[in-house]
């Protein structure tokens, strides 16, 4: 049996039509807003990926430039050492002023790179910068001898100074 009767809309169904149209409009608006947000996210993601790549490149360039500056600062010392070898046939005592000059230039080069010597003889022993390798009679807690110079780069310790530290008063002073 077929139902060929025309569909008659009830007044309630007619009242729902404006609501359906409003909801369709809201759905379209939300779809457009979602698409805009998605596009914004994709642009931000691409920008962030480009930023990460740029930061890696800048870090590599900074490291390369730092090494370049260090090499350039030390080339003068290399030149001085090569000149000193040219005087190898000279008496050893005649080489001392030249070697001293090379040492001074090398120290200046290190200082230009921000490298400084750790305080040595006469300084208070500081375990942050000194490594005690022995003790001798002398003022307690003072560095008496530097076996190997220590260096720091800013706040970073490159190498501790290996030192001999004073152990206290001499025996004859203690008895008096």
Swiss-Prot record:
Which coarse location class describes where this protein primarily resides?
Answer: cytoplasm
A single BP term in Gene Ontology: protein folding
Q: Where in the cell is it found?
A: Cytoplasm
Q: What gene makes this protein?
A: grpE
Could you confirm whether the keyword Membrane appears in this record?
A: no
Which InterPro entries does the annotation name? GrpE, GrpE_coiled_coil, GrpE_head
Cellular component terms (Gene Ontology): cytoplasm
What are the GO MF terms of this UniProt record? adenyl-nucleotide exchange factor activity; protein homodimerization activity; protein-folding chaperone binding; unfolded protein binding
Organism lineage: Bacteria, Thermotogati, Deinococcota, Deinococci, Thermales
Give the protein name, as stated in the record: Protein GrpE
Keywords noted in UniProt: Chaperone, Cytoplasm, Stress response
**HAMAP family, per database record:** GrpE
Q: Tell me, what does this protein do in biology?
A: Participates actively in the response to hyperosmotic and heat shock by preventing the aggregation of stress-denatured proteins, in association with DnaK and GrpE. It is the nucleotide exchange factor for DnaK and may function as a thermosensor. Unfolded proteins bind initially to DnaJ; upon interaction with the DnaJ-bound protein, DnaK hydrolyzes its bound ATP, resulting in the formation of a stable complex. GrpE releases ADP from DnaK; ATP binding to DnaK triggers the release of the substrate protein, thus completing the reaction cycle.
Gene3D superfamilies attached here?
Answer: 3.90.20.20, Head domain of nucleotide exchange factor GrpE
Subunit (UniProt): Homodimer.
At the top level of its lineage, which domain of life is listed?
Bacteria
Organism, scientific name: Meiothermus ruber
* Annotated disulfide bonds: none
What family name appears in the similarity comment?
Belongs to the GrpE family.
């Amino acid at each position: 049996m077929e139902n060929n009767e025309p569909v008659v809309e009830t007044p309630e169904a007619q009242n729902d039509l404006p609501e359906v149209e409003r909801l369709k409009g809201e759905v379209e608006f939300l779809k457009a807003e979602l698409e805009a947000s998605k596009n914004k996210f994709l642009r931000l993601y691409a920008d962030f990926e480009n930023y990460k790549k740029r930061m890696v490149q800048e870090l590599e360039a900074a490291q390369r430039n730092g090494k370049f500056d260090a090499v350039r600062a030390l080339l003068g010392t290399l030149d001085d050492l090569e000149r000193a070898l040219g005087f190898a046939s000279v008496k050893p005592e005649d080489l001392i002023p030249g070697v001293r000059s090379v040492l001074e230039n090398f120290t200046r080069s290190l200082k230009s790179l921000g490298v400084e010597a750790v305080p040595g003889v006469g300084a208070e022993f500081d375990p942050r910068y000194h490594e005690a390798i022995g003790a001798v009679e002398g003022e307690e807690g003072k560095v008496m001898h530097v076996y190997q110079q220590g260096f720091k780069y800013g706040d970073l310790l490159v190498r501790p100074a290996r030192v001999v530290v004073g152990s206290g008063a001499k025996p004859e002073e203690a008895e008096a």
